[in-house]
Amino acid sequence: MILVNVHAGNCDNTLKNFKKKLQRELYFRKMKEQRYYETPSAKRVRKAQEAARRIRKFARKKMYEE
C-alpha cells in the first residue's frame, strides 16, 4: 500500500509524489502487463528481449566510459 502525506492542502505536490511512488514500484508496468493474458512462451520471449536490451545498454555505457 502506498501512503502519501498531504501537507496544508497542497494537492499538486501530493499528486506528483503519488505518481512518482507508483512509478518506483513499477505499478504502471504491472497494470499494462496484466491487461491481457500473455502466454508463457510470449512471456519468455519478452523477458529474453528485455534482458538483451539491458545488456546492450550496459555495454554501450561501458564503451563510452572507457
Curated annotation (Swiss-Prot):
Keywords: Ribonucleoprotein, Ribosomal protein. One of its GO terms (molecular function) is structural constituent of ribosome. It holds the Pfam family Ribosomal_S21. GO terms for biological process: translation. One of its GO terms (cellular component) is ribosome. Transmembrane segments: none annotated. Gene3D superfamilies: Ribosomal protein S8. Belongs to the bacterial ribosomal protein bS21 family. HAMAP family: Ribosomal_bS21 (MF_00358). NCBIfam families: S21p. This is Small ribosomal subunit protein bS21.
